[in-house]
Amino acid sequence: MTVKEYTKSKLPCSILNIKPTVTKSGEDAPLLVWIPGNPGLLYYYQEMLHHLHLKHPDWEILGISHAGMTLNAHSNTPIFSLQDQVDHQVEVINNFSCKNRKIIIMGHSVGAYIVQKVCLSNKLVGSVQKVGLVTPTVMDIHTSEMGIKMTAALRYIPPLAHVVSLFSYIFFYWILSEGFSRFIIDKFMGCGSTGYQAVLSTRIFLTHRQFVRQSLGLAAQEMEEITTNWEFQDRFINYCEENGISIWFLFSSNDHWVSGKTRSHLSDYYKDKVKQERLKIDVTDKIPHSFVVKHAEYAINAFF
């Protein structure tokens, strides 16, 4: 159950694939697809996906990194767009799916927006049964607390992705020792004893220039594309209604990337448009936006 390089896709990536330990003869296990949020590194989600497997041993679990977010990616790997990420996810999912195979697809943060796009792709193979949108940045990300700061930073420093990636590489790879960099990351993120994997994942992220460049490059596009777009939400809702797909939202009430206004508007809109039996909306103050840092086990046991 480790993150591995995946070589069967057009764009460089890694996957975490956990086979079911409880099976039914004569039928494929449901395929749970997990799409991470930005920066798209699967290392952050190893613990979470492990706990998800323990809770649902009859599922095959497939975590797919963002394109470019793998250790074997070349340092000159270009910044892949949101559409590149959508096409990439569809390609990898299709390599594990087949016609009529039951798919449960979930995404975290911008991964939730990618999930919506993936579902609407006419190239996706399989039968989507349920969609999970976890601390989702699917609309008006630029109006959130962190979105406002990110938009301002990009306005004043247009080449932000390239500047920060260079600084991060020099500082965390060349100047700081591994032990001291872990110490700084731990203190800055407040990981504590339960966030060791998050510290390791963040150090991997910060010491690979192409990861930081890809992450901030994608974030810049998120600020421009993920705005007010009820027409897109209508398309997604109609697709789910026509195909009998259940929709689940998990919101954090103290999310710095999703404003309270956006959360309320989305919740009210979906309640008006989606049949009650196919919609579940959870709002909690028990997890932050980046719940996988210290709250992975709790989130899985409480909500998934």
From Swiss-Prot:
The record's disulfide annotation reads none
Under the cellular component aspect of Gene Ontology, which terms does the record hold? cytoplasm; lipid droplet; membrane
Give the residue interval(s) assigned to the motif GXSXG.
Answer: 107-111
Q: PROSITE patterns under this entry?
A: LIPASE_SER
Question: What highest taxon heads this organism's lineage?
Answer: Eukaryota
Stretches in topological domain Lumenal: 1-155, 177-304
Keyword annotations for this protein, in alphabetical order, are: Glycoprotein, Hydrolase, Lipid droplet, Membrane
Substrates-to-products reaction catalysed: a triacylglycerol + H2O = a diacylglycerol + a fatty acid + H(+)
Task: Spell out the InterPro entries in the cross-references.
Answer: AB_hydrolase_fold, LDAH
Stated membrane topology is: Peripheral membrane protein
One GO MF term on file is: hydrolase activity, acting on ester bonds
Its BP terms in the Gene Ontology are:
lipid metabolic process; lipid storage; triglyceride catabolic process
Null mutant phenotype: Accumulates lipid droplets.
**In its keyword annotation, does this UniProt entry include Acetylation?**
no
Q: Which residues are intramembrane?
A: 156-176
Q: Which residues form the active site?
A: S109 (nucleophile)
Keyword Hydrolase attached = yes
The catalytic activity of this protein is classed by the Enzyme Commission as: 3.1.1.3
What does the record say about pH dependence? Optimum pH is 7.5.
Give the principal location in a single coarse category: other
Q: What else is known?
A: Present with 2190 molecules/cell in log phase SD medium.
Q: What does this protein do?
A: Shows both triacylglycerol (TAG) lipase and ester hydrolase activities. May play a role in TAG homeostasis.
Q: Which family does it belong to?
A: Belongs to the AB hydrolase superfamily. LDAH family.
Q: What is the protein named?
A: Lipid droplet-associated triacylglycerol lipase
Organism of provenance: Saccharomyces cerevisiae (strain ATCC 204508 / S288c)
